[in-house]
Amino acid sequence: MTALMVRIRQEHRSIAEEVTQLFRETHEFLSATTAHRQEQAKQQAQQLHQFHQNLEQTTHEFLTETTTQRVAQAEAQANFLHKFHQNLEQTTQEFLAETAKNRTEQAKAQSQYLQQFRKDLFASIFGTF
């Protein structure tokens, strides 16, 4: 019976040692996994931070370039419209001056024609003066 008790104690110790060993291995595995995951998370956080900084830099450069282009385009458009407006005003003034001159000449010609017509009409009706 004592041999059986000794054997039971040995098996109990063996089981306890196996449980302790399994606990240690599980703890080591979980510690290693936690450390690995923390390192991965740290790397991902660094990569994400770098990506965010690059994105902000790229966005800033893009917006700066776009703003510069749009300002240059607006200035060119303003210059074009200013020149167009000046040309339009000059052309309008020239047209109005030419039209006024032509109408004045036409009015003078009509006036002379009507005076001559009137003289001729009086001459034909009343005879020569």
From Swiss-Prot:
Primary location: other
Subcellular localization: Gas vesicle
Which cellular components does GO assign to this protein?
A: gas vesicle
User: Region (3 X 33 AA tandem repeats): which ranges?
Assistant: 19-117
Output the InterPro entries linked to this UniProt entry.
Answer: Gas-vesicle_GvpC, Gas_vesicle_C_repeat
Write out the ranges of the repeats annotated as sequence.
19-51, 52-84, 85-117
Cite the entry's keywords alphabetically. Gas vesicle, Repeat
User: Biological process (GO) annotations?
Assistant: gas vesicle organization
- Give the top-rank taxon of the lineage listed in the UniProt record for this protein: Bacteria
Task: Decide whether keyword Flavoprotein is in the record.
Answer: no
Q: Output the Pfam families linked to this UniProt entry.
A: Gas_vesicle_C
The record's similarity note reads: Belongs to the gas vesicle GvpC family.
What's this protein's function?
Confers stability, involved in shaping gas vesicles, hollow, gas filled proteinaceous nanostructures. During planktonic growth they allow positioning of the organism at a favorable depth for light or nutrient acquisition.
Q: What is this protein called?
A: Gas vesicle protein C
